[in-house]
């Protein structure tokens, strides 16, 4: 129960993270903000049952990075450490997706096989391409997130990391979904034409 509640609360906090950091920095509430983040990220690191998969690895890695940044921020009394969290999240996602390019099935292919275990060769090539596109997205997103940190403009940092990066991600997801629907329709048509 506590684990489920902390996971849900952490998801909300992660979505609102840029705005919470902006609020905490401008209100001088670093102790409250840092303490709250340490508590939430710490709860996310608690052991859970089941198999340790890549999604659990990702969640724990993100929580570990968040915990470390919050601790350093509190100890050094320097809020700028908190600004690096979106950069590290993009880096972790890049590692997860890129690593799968050297495995028999990419991450996107494994997700696609949850809906259709018998993917045709063209769909497998497509999922590899989508995985590569996501890798490119995480490189660009991480670079832009780092740029907002280095520019030192909290409003710009909050705007990009709290809104624009999500809009870019949603646009990529939506565009990929439309492209996938076209591919599925084309594959269905070619399958029907191939039948005697």
Where are these regions (language model features)?
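Structural signature of hydrophobic alpha-helical transmembrane segments
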Residues: 24-37, 163-166
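N-terminal membrane topogenic signal
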Residues: 1-10
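A cytosolic-side transmembrane-helix exit/cap motif
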Residues: 50-59, 80-84, 103-115, 179-187
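Long, highly hydrophobic alpha-helical transmembrane signal-anchor segments
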Residues: 48-90, 146
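Short, hydrophobic transmembrane alpha-helix segments
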Residues: 18-31, 45-51
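Membrane-proximal helix-loop-helix units in multi-pass membrane proteins
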Residues: 77-128
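C-terminal membrane-adjacent module
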Residues: 117-196
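Hydrophobic alpha-helical transmembrane segments of multipass integral membrane proteins
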Residues: 11, 15-18, 38-42, 64-71, ...
